[in-house]
Design a protein with these regions (language model features):
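Substrate-binding cleft/loops of secretory-pathway carbohydrate-active enzymes
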Residues: 123-134
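Extended hydrophobic secondary-structure segments that form protein cores and membrane-embedded regions
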Residues: 77, 119-123
Length: 134
């Protein structure tokens, strides 16, 4: 993924990176539609679900850290179409999604120092009032 992003940047483009992952953060597209996160305990510090969530979010960090060394920015578009309800990150509702997004942004920016990411929130057309998802 990062080599393709670097190649695109070298040709004058700005790479976009999406992340289709299951709620375990290690599986792929089919699992993002079928798996679930334990929302009740995922944001409770010290729980097993919280540890799994933090480890899962960090799973993409080593790959993303390969970009800044070459001065490559990226349009980072995780958890898109969250308002549609067909992916695990949207089925937990708007409040949980916002907590997830903010946690990821905080970890990536402040804990891991990823400052080359341009954060993109990608809605579907399934919801008219998108304000709760911000």
């Amino acid at each position: 993924m990062t080599q393709r992003a670097k190649d695109w940047w070298a040709r004058g483009g700005i790479p976009t990176i999406c992340w289709h992952t299951g709620a375990d953060f290690f599986s792929g597209y089919p699992e993002c539609r079928e798996s679930e996160l334990d929302w009740a305990s995922a944001f409770v510090d010290g729980t097993e679900a919280n540890r799994r969530l933090l480890d899962g979010l960090d799973h993409a960090v080593p790959e993303l850290k390969r970009l800044p060394s070459d001065g490559v920015p990226a349009l980072w578009r995780p958890f898109h179409e969250m308002d549609g309800g067909w992916f695990w990150w949207g089925r937990g509702g708007a409040a949980n999604f916002v907590r997830l997004w903010r946690l990821m942004h905080d970890r990536y920016t402040h804990v891991h120092g990823l400052r080359n990411l341009i954060w993109v929130l990608g809605f579907s057309d399934a919801t008219e009032d998108l304000r709760p998802w911000y």
